[in-house]
């Protein structure tokens, strides 16, 4: 009701994968489309929002990262570069001399806030943390709904106390990055348990996210008290997503997923590949901070891909990826709705 959408189905915002076309298709079908803008510059974020608004008159959400910025630990970085050096050398390359912070945080960049205030999408969501009070106040005054991901009750209560409108309950099954605020503490709660926990202790609407691929699963989450569901992995295969051919192929052929922090510096669930089998070992050095580690992973993947080795890609996927179906976004939304009604 707050979002004025027909169906309680959200497209998960996926940085690097979501496109204005995909967002618009979901919104035009009565769901809530989304743009994952955490990896964008303010200028490109603005362009994506305007393009989406040209493709749909319906509501959609935009998403940004609220990670705590940290200085690069030079010693950690050196050890990590040395550890990955053999993988670069295998392709006749050398790792870079230094690592860069490739993703600025919304917390440090009011240019992102100004883009949102200027373009006025219906809703804005945040991952890894909560925006500053002045940012929340500005969004509220502009009439823009705010949403933040929570992976545990402590985060959910902090979100509610901050004056945010909606809580996204991200379970351990979810593909991509854990929205966890403090990486040293992860209760690894599954989506269904998390939804019930937050519904019991908080008054805000809760959106269930993580491992949802079918209308039956969506219906189950709504039955537990969720106001809506958010799906990401199910939509990555759509033609209008920005996923590579290799990523799409992996979604349909490799149903094993694993959580690792070695790709980006933060824990994220993806399809099992070299990062999990060759890089992650009990004796490996501790990776540098997010997003410095991601800078290196992207460079290694680019080099390996030129040699037709796609095992270093960030093929994010949820734990139920085996249930993925080849459907275009409008058809997938319709199918989910039919399944939700059929299961009544």
Question: Which residues does each PLM region occupy?
Answer:
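Conserved active-site-proximal phosphate/metal-binding subdomains
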Residues: 177-207, 212-344
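Active-site entrance/lid segments in N-terminal catalytic domains of soluble metabolic enzymes
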Residues: 1-201
């Amino acid at each position: 009701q707050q979002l004025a959408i027909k169906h309680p189905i959200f497209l998960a915002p996926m940085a690097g994968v979501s496109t204005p076309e995909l967002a618009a298709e979901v919104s035009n079908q009565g769901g809530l489309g989304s743009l994952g803008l955490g990896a964008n510059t303010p200028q490109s974020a603005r362009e994506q929002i305007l393009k989406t608004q040209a493709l749909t008159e319906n509501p959609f959400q935009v998403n940004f990262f609220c990670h705590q910025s940290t200085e690069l630990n030079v010693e950690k970085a050196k050890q990590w570069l040395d550890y990955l050096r053999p993988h670069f050398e295998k392709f006749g390359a050398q790792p870079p001399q230094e690592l860069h912070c490739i993703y600025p945080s919304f917390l440090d960049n009011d240019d992102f806030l100004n883009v949102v205030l200027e373009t006025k999408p219906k809703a804005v969501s945040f991952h890894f943390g909560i925006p500053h009070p002045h940012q929340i106040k500005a969004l509220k005054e502009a009439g823009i709904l705010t949403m933040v991901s929570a992976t545990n009750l402590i985060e959910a209560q902090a979100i509610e106390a901050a004056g945010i409108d909606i809580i996204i309950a991200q379970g351990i099954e979810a593909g991509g990055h854990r929205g966890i605020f403090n990486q040293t503490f992860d209760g690894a709660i599954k989506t269904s348990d998390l939804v019930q926990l937050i519904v019991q202790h908080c008054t805000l609407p809760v959106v269930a996210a993580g491992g949802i691929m079918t209308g039956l699963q969506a219906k189950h989450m709504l039955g537990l008290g969720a106001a809506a569901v958010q799906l990401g992995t199910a939509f990555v295969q759509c033609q209008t997503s920005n996923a590579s051919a290799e990523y799409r192929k992996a979604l349909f052929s490799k149903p094993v997923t694993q959580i690792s922090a070695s790709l980006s510096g933060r824990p994220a669930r993806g399809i099992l590949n070299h990062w999990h089998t060759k890089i992650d070992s009990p004796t490996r050095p501790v990776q540098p901070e997010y997003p410095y580690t991601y800078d290196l992973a992207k460079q290694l993947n680019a080099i390996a891909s030129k040699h037709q080795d796609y095992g270093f890609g960030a093929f994010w996927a949820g734990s139920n990826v085996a249930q993925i179906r080849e459907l275009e976004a409008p058809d997938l939304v319709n199918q989910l709705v039919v399944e939700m009604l059929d299961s009544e």
